[in-house]
């Protein structure tokens, strides 16, 4: 039972131990991963030139990208609008070095080939017939404007592929519109006599040539992979009807042509009768404007109807009256004409109706019946006929871009896309339409259209984005639609800080009065520091403003389509930096909208307010504390040139990724070398030196060879040296960070941190010999200056002058003078504690693992102690002397003979037990008095027994007596038992007649049973 109870805790504690081990391994794994993904990069400036609208983008939780390092940087840009005028440039600069490259062309589907122009192709006809065997396709250059000269625009060649053969035709882009139309005629053998066939259309772009229209003759070969798809066109065996039907009343319908008519053209309108027409007389009144006249009225069935035409000319209108009589027999058996057509009206168009501009001419139709009420005669139908000297085939809107990023809610500045309307005629000519245009947006919550219909825009009040939002345009009787994609920001903004807790930097003081409350100091030191005009430097953090953009479904669903993907964010820092501020500027301030500077301890937040409604678009809490951190070391990267690589992405046609590397090969003599610095703090944060004011950084550079390096010119290198000569083994440069010279007092002359950079290839690591331990670790090269003359202690190396990136602080003074100044101007001892070496994340994980194991062992030990104490409390008080002894038995006397009880007790006390047997302690109580006796073989009975004799004053009465037999202690001179012998407890045994009262509760009343029981007891004794 005891072993089972002791083994019970093993199960749950074993599970806890396994869980702790798994947690520790996860900590180590995460620590290992974090150790390889330090947020460092080469702080080179990357900028796009000649790109009107672009954004920096990043993946959630991946900044900088994984391929960035101390010597490289990678950035992804998103170009929203194409660039027909010139290819944009991406420039990378890290003074004094700079390079640039032309952004590669956009990648288009389906073959992911880059093309230098962004072209939109629109098919005008969806079907062609043998009567009109022409396929017309409009090509439009999207993007910004281009030079007016025709030399820079390419040609577009349309390719048609049919089972019967191939055909192609080219056109040259017009500089005025940036568009052209290809009219390709299909051969007659492509048309089937009974079935509809299909031809596939594709296009290619080619430089302008010397052929007709400025394009080359082309080849008959199939375009294969170079062609970009346009769509398909159907080839019908016969002409489809091109007319429209309009009812004049309940029984008469007008059928009119649905195509524009040209000057001098004749066309015919047809009247149709329903079968329930029963009238015998019908009068048709037609009123037309000048330029159009009715030439004839012919009945479709002269045997049943007659038609008489009367014409009346007016100053503005011409009226034609057509009277129709039924000539068939009248009566109940007469039936209406079986043919639906019963009257043909011929019209003629006069020349010079519109001066080349499309116009409409209204034609008024009115039916009159005999005996008709005067009110019914007022019902008229007006039909407009489109007149044009050109055979206009389609109205097409041209937009500069097909997608729009709605940044108006962030900036308050409307975003516009210019739109131009053009018409396409049968000869392939283009004409811009500027007057009498109508337009309407299908969803004003996503996109709006201007009153002049020359642009679509977003003003900031829109609440959604969408893909394929439609804007309708119409001109005369022609209609067209433009579909766009609008990306809307998903608020709130994400404000990303490189460090949300800014702390004081130990030992780093900068010029300027103390801002706010300083650290607790003595009054004398406070006055002294204020008199010197130096204050503590707080950490700084970089600030970036990010937001995802998405398009909502048009059907009102909840599934969003994200720009680039759900895990991509657009950097809008350049748009919202002017509207961002710190809520409490006493605690921190924003410099340039990109750098957060701590001022005094406190908690505040950065917030961005909308310029339209003053609402908060985004907020991020931050804290400035008076806790101190140390600069552990400097990470130095020499830059002797930069290389740039550009690549196109696959998530979006405008995605461009730029990767820049620092060249760190063996420098040539007199070569300038820039140094990139990163500060590593004891709170496991990293910051580039560019975050700090260059005047607050005191940097010194030293080398082993005194003449190896000299300072670089300040106006060229931000922090650099000129290398005079480097051996084949490379040259180490040692960089040290100090406070600025005005605040470099006393012990503050000790470098805050230092780092080493190798020019050329660093040497292979070799095992260091055993050296005697030194009391303190000192920098390998120490600099000093006396009256402006630069020296190096011990003649160990050379150094360069003041400044960060070209401005080196003055070197330190002599060691003796430094010690004197240190005694005169003693600073806080806390600030002068040497910065501890950085503990890596892997070491932290190992320490965490060790701590967890120790904690598990401690918990197990405490559990064991608690378990032992718990079971010790369950032992009886009489067995304290011998925990292995059995528990005592409380025997109950049920007899009435008090004298017999006394006699039995006296007999027990006077008898001497055999050797090896224990005594029989007797215990009885009356009135609360108890006594215990435990005789042994070496003790006298008088000193170990207690006899309880009770006499009752009221006569003989039946009593119940309680007697306790305690176990006897071991004999003092007992012989040693053999090893492994069982432990036997001796008890005092009386005769059968003396202990009958003892065993009655055991059910042993038969003498034979009692005798056997006593023999077993003696045998065990």
Swiss-Prot record:
Residues 870-1021 are cytoplasmic. One of its GO terms (molecular function) is protein homodimerization activity. One of its GO terms (cellular component) is endoplasmic reticulum. Residues 207-226, 793-835, 903-955 are annotated as: Disordered. Expressed in the brain in neuronal cells of the hypothalamus, thalamus, cerebral cortex, amygdala, and cerebellum. Residues 1-32 form the signal peptide. The keyword Methyltransferase does not apply. Residues 821-832 have a biased composition (Acidic residues). InterPro entries: Ig_TMEM132_2nd, Ig_TMEM132_5th, Ig_TMEM132_6th, TMEM132, TMEM132_3rd, TMEM132_C, TMEM132_M, TMEM132_N. Glycans are attached at residue 276. May play a role in embryonic and postnatal development of the brain. Increased resistance to cell death induced by serum starvation in cultured cells. Regulates cAMP-induced GFAP gene expression via STAT3 phosphorylation. This is Transmembrane protein 132A. It comes from Rattus norvegicus (Rat).
């Amino acid at each position: 039972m005891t072993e089972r109870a002791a083994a019970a805790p093993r199960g749950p504690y074993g599970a806890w131990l396994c869980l702790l081990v798994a947690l520790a391994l996860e900590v180590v794994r995460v620590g290992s991963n974090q150790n390889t993904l330090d947020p460092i990069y080469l702080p080179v400036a990357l900028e796009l030139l000649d790109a009107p609208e672009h954004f920096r983008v990043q993946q959630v939780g991946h900044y900088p990208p994984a391929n960035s390092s101390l010597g490289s940087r990678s950035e992804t840009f998103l170009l929203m609008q194409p660039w027909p005028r010139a290819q944009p440039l991406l420039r990378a600069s890290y003074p004094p070095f700079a390079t640039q490259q032309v952004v590669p062309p956009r990648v288009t589907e389906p073959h992911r080939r880059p093309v230098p122009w962004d072209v939109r192709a629109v098919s005008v006809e969806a079907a062609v017939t043998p009567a009109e065997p022409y396929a017309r396709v409009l090509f439009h250059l999207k993007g910004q404007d281009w030079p007016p000269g025709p030399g820079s625009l390419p040609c577009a060649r349309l390719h048609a592929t049919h089972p019967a053969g191939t055909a192609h035709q080219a056109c040259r882009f017009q500089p005025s519109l940036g568009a052209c139309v290809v009219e390709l005629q299909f051969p007659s053998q492509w048309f089937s006599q009974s079935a509809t066939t299909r031809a596939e259309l594709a296009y290619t772009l080619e430089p302008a040539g010397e052929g007709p229209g400025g394009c080359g003759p082309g080849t008959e070969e199939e375009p294969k992979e170079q062609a970009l798809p346009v769509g398909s066109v159907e080839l019908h065996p016969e002409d489809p009807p091109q007319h429209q039907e309009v009812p004049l009343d309940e029984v008469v319908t007008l059928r009119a042509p649905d195509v524009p008519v040209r000057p001098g053209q004749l066309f015919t309108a047809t009247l149709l009768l329903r079968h329930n027409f029963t009238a015998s007389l019908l009068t048709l009144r037609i009123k037309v404007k000048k330029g159009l006249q009715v030439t004839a009225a012919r009945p479709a069935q002269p045997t049943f109807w007659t038609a008489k035409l009367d014409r009346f000319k007016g100053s503005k209108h011409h009226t034609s009256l057509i009277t129709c009589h039924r000539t068939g027999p009248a009566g109940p058996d007469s039936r209406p004409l079986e043919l639906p057509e019963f009257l043909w009206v011929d019209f003629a168009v006069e020349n010079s109706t519109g001066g080349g501009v499309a116009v409409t001419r209204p034609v008024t139709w009115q039916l009159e019946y005999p005996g008709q009420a005067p009110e019914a005669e007022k019902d008229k139908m007006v039909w407009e006929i489109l007149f044009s000297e050109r055979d206009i085939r389609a109205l097409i809107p041209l937009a500069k871009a097909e997608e729009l990023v709605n940044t108006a809610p962030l900036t308050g500045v409307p975003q516009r896309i210019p739109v131009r309307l053009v018409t396409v005629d049968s000869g392939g000519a283009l004409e811009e339409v500027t007057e009498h245009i109508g337009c309407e947006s299908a969803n004003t919550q996503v996109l709006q259209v201007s009153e002049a219909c020359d642009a679509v825009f977003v003003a900031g009040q829109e609440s959604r984005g969408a893909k394929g939002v439609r804007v309708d345009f119409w001109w005369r009787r022609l209609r067209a639609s433009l579909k766009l994609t609008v990306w809307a920001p998903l608020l709130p903004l994400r404000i990303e800080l490189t460090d949300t807790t800014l702390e004081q930097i130990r030992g780093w003081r900068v010029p300027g009065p103390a801002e706010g409350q300083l650290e607790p100091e003595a009054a004398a030191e406070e006055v002294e520091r204020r008199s010197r005009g130096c204050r503590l430097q707080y950490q700084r953090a970089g600030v970036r403003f990010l937001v995802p953009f998405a398009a909502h479904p048009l059907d009102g669903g909840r599934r969003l389509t994200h720009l680039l993907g759900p895990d991509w964010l657009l950097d809008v820092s350049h748009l919202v930096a002017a509207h961002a501020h710190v809520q409490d500027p006493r605690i921190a301030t924003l410099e340039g909208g990109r750098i957060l500077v701590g001022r005094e301890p406190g908690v505040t937040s950065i917030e961005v307010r909308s310029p339209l409604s003053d609402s908060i678009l985004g907020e991020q809490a931050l804290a400035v504390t008076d806790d101190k951190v140390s600069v552990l070391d400097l990470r130095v990267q020499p830059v002797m040139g930069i290389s740039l690589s550009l690549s196109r992405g696959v998530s979006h046609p405008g995605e461009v990724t730029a990767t820049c590397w620092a060249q760190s090969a063996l420098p040539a003599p007199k070569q300038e070398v820039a140094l990139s610095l990163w500060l590593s703090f004891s709170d496991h944060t990293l910051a580039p030196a560019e975050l700090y004011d260059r005047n607050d950084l005191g940097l010194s550079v030293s080398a082993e060879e005194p003449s190896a390096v000299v300072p670089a010119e300040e106006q060229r290198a931000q922090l650099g040296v000129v290398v005079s000569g480097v051996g084949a083994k490379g040259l180490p440069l040692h960089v040290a960070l100090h406070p600025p010279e005005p605040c470099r007092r006393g012990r503050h002359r000790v470098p805050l941190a230092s780092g080493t950079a190798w020019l050329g290839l660093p040497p292979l690591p070799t095992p260091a010999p055993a050296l005697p331990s030194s009391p303190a670790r000192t920098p390998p090269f120490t600099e000093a200056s006396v009256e402006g003359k630069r020296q190096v202690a011990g003649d160990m190396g050379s150094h360069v002058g003041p400044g960060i990136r070209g401005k080196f602080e003055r070197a330190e003074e002599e060691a003796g003078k430094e010690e004197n100044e240190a005694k005169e101007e003693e600073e806080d001892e806390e600030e002068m504690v040497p910065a501890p070496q950085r503990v890596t994340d892997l070491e932290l994980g190992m320490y965490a693992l060790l701590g967890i194991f120790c904690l598990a062992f401690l918990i197990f030990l405490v559990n064991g102690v608690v378990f032992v104490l718990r079971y010790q409390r369950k032992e009886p008080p009489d067995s304290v002397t011998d925990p292995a002894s059995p528990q005592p038995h409380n025997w109950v006397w049920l007899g009435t003979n008090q004298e017999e009880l006394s006699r039995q007790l006296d007999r027990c006390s006077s008898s001497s037990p055999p050797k090896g047997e224990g005594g029989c302690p007797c215990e009885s109580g009356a009135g609360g008095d108890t006594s215990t006796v435990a005789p042994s073989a070496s003790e006298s009975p008088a000193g170990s027994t207690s006899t309880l004799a009770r006499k009752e004053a009221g006569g003989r009465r039946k009593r119940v007596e309680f007697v306790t037999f305690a176990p006897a202690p071991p004999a003092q001179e007992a012989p040693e038992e053999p090893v492994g012998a069982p432990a036997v407890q001796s008890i005092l045994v009386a005769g059968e007649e003396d202990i009958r009262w003892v065993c009655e509760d055991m059910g042993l009343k038969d003498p034979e049973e009692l005798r056997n029981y006593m023999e077993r007891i003696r045998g065990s004794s």
